[in-house]
Amino acid sequence: MMRYKCVVSYVGRNYSGWQSQRKGDSIQEILEAVIERITQEKVNVIGSGRTDAGVNASAQVFMFDTKRKMPARKWMGAINAFLPDDIHIMAVEEEDDCFHARYNVRFKQYNYRINHGPYNVFTKDTVFQCPMHLDVEKMREGIPYLVGTHDFTSLNSSSLEEYPDQVRTVRSITLTEEDGVITLAFVGKGFLRYMVRMMASVFIEIGKHKYEPSHIQEILDAKRKSFPHKNSPAEGLTLEYVDYFKTLALDETGMVREFLMGDDTSCTNQELSVLEQAVKENASHQFYAMTTRHSQELLGYYEINQGEASLHILEEERGIPLANILLPQLEKRLQKQVIFKQIQIYNKSGKIVSNSVEETK
């Protein structure tokens, strides 16, 4: 089977959102129908995440597996030939089994655009047309309240039954203005349903002088779904960009993936400092984080130094079983080198608890 990574742009006005609704009018359903027409086989399109009805995308990422092998350029042309003119494939790449469009996401950027100048008929589907002028400087004052890790229960519509933990990390929010259009850029690994649109609505209300920027703290502290808030119109929101980890091994329960200093928004437990210290002490080595697949909890790290590789377990109960599951994939990558030594697994005390194949030349 071949795996292809695709980047798609779309204007969401005419569609029920990304996820299949069994009505045939979602972006996912349309893409699946087109690709199945080309491959003559059942295809499952998996996106980086959902966008709601009316929401746009400049660079939504999705993947699909197929027996049909074609050059990326031909795939792009073939799919676009059958798509409506408000959905367009921007890029296609062949990927290996370690790539996953949803689980390998490092962060996403959503932009919310507000026109607070004269009504613009040409941008009505991609920019919210605000009927009054907004105080941009007041809006900027609200940004620090939402950046960082907070409980966003009051600022999303995801049910507590489905998502009991509604703590999320917003990496950054920036506000720019050009020609009467305000752009709010939100960056984070993941957002709850309507979370970005509700945050945008808060900024709009501040811009209208409905309340002071400090009111955001009251909203966050309330931690309840019944707290009064609005959801800003869908057309102003665009999924702008999706960034991915380089991944060396992937399983249903975990992965070994790229690690960069400052990557604390994805590693959710206290063992992060151990990995960061190892990186500082061995700057010439390559380091990868071994994490759970969904929550990105750090269970250990993978270190490579000139053909020698080792897995260091930071949380033994789950880390050692996961390391042994991922070991064959890591071995396969090392075997592509002319010389490599066995991969050893160390526990927190520095004791070898397992190792891979015998030294090979």
Q: Positions of the model-derived regions?
A:
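Hydrophobic alpha-helical core bundles mediating ligand binding, dimerization, or RNAP-core interactions
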Residues: 256-263, 271, 275
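Short N-terminal amphipathic alpha-helix/helix-capping patch enriched in small hydrophobics
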Residues: 23, 27, 31, 252-256, ...
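Short amphipathic alpha-helical segments
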Residues: 52, 275-276, 327, 331
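Active-site rim helix/loop that mediates acceptor-substrate recognition in acyltransferases
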Residues: 267-287, 291-294
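Short, surface-exposed beta-strand-loop junctions and turns on beta-sheet-rich folds
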Residues: 190-192, 263, 316
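Structured-RNA-binding interfaces characteristic of tRNA pseudouridine synthases
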Residues: 1-246
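N-terminal basic, amphipathic alpha-helical segments
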Residues: 52, 263-266
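Acyl-donor (CoA/ACP) binding surface of acyl/acetyltransferases
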Residues: 247-260, 287-361
